[in-house]
Amino acid sequence: MREPVVPGQGQCWGGRNYKFDSAEQQQWMELMGAKGWTAPDWPTEYGGGGLDKLQHKILKEEMARINARSPLDSFGIWMIGPALLEFGSEALKQQHLPPIVRGEIRWCQGYSEPGSGSDLAGLQAKGEDRGDHFIANGQKVWTSYADKADWMFCLLRTDPEAKKQMGISLVLFDMRTPGVTPKPILLISGNSPFCETFLDDVRVEKDQVVGEVNKGWTIAKYLLTHEREMIGSMGMTSPASETLGQIAARTFGIEQGRMNNPMLRAEVAKWEIDGACFALTAERVTDEIKSGSGVGATSAMLKYYGTELNKRRFETLLKIAGSDGVVWDGEDSKGGWLPRTWLRTKGNSIEGGTSEIQLNVIAKNILGLG
C-alpha cells in the first residue's frame, strides 16, 4: 500500500458490493478500520480512533513519512459522518457511524436536482408525511456513485407551504429500498461517476431523519462546508500521490524530451510550490474550523483554489506528455487515464458550487465587499 496512486485509480471506497483491487488493499482497509484510523478523530464509542488534535496530526505525518495510501475514501467519513456527529440522534450515530469507519457501507449524496443545483434551496423532491414515515418522490441528479452506493443522505421538502429555505429535512435511506432507481450519466471522459436518481414512492422512516423535521437546511449548509473542503482537497498531493516532477521523471524522464524545456520545468516547480502552500493552508483552516475559530467562508476559499490547482496540475501533465497525452487506448496509456482525468477535472470547478459562486462568497464574507 505504498505504490503511487494514479489519479482516479487506486482509491478504496468500501461498501457491501465493493471489489477490492487486491487482497492487500482489503487487508489495509480492514486493519485500519479495526483501529478506528479510517476516522482517527472520531470518538471511540462510534468506532473512531479517539485521537486528539496532536495525535491525529502525528498519525498523518507518520502515514506521509512511510508513503502510505489512504485506507478508505468515503463520503461517509468526509460528509455524512461529521453531520451525524454534530446533529444526529444517539440511535443514528450508533447505527451508521461504526459501519462507515469499517468501510462496510458506502454513501452517496442526494442534493442537486435538475432545476436546483447552485440554488439548492429551490429543491422540489418531496417527502409526504404518513405518520411514522415519509413517502419520497422526485429526482436527484449528479449523484456521485449512486449506482454503487449502499445508502443515501438526501434532502427532501417535507413542508411545501414553508418558505424556500424552510420545510427541508435531511433523511437517510437504503438504496435497496423499493422505488430508488439510479441511472449512470456517461461523461465526455468516458466514465460514469454521476447518476440520475429517481425516487418513486420511496418509504423513509422518520427515525432516519437527521436533526429535526423541516429544519434540515442548517445541516445541509454544514454538509456543504465539508463537501467543499473535500472537493478542494483534490488540489493537494496525498501521501501516496506522486508530485508532477516525480510523474515526469518516472514516465518521460527528466533529462530528455520536453522536460529539457526550462519553461516547463519552471511550471512544474511553480505548481509544486503552490501545492505545498495550499496543503499547509488547508491544514491550518481545518484546525481552525474544528476548534471553532475559523471564518465560515474559508471552505469556499479552499474549494475555489483547490479545484483550480487541480485543473492546473492536469494541464501541466498534458504538456509534459505531449502527443502521448491524447492517447485514449493502448497498452502504454493505462486506459487513457491522463486525458480522461484531464477532462474530468473540468467539472471540479462546477460541482459542489461553481468557482463563480465561491468567489462571491469569498468577496462578501472574507473581504467584506458588497
Positions of the model-derived regions?
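C-terminal helix-coil-helix/basic helical segment that borders enzyme active sites and/or dimer interfaces
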Residues: 9-16, 253, 258-265, 276-331
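A short, Trp-centered hydrophobic/proline-enriched beta-strand micro-motif
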Residues: 103-111, 155
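A structural signal for short hydrophobic beta-strand segments in well-ordered beta-sheet cores
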Residues: 125-128
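A short core secondary-structure module
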Residues: 132-133, 137-183
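Glycine-rich beta->alpha junctions and the first turn(s) of the following alpha-helix
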Residues: 180-280, 348, 364
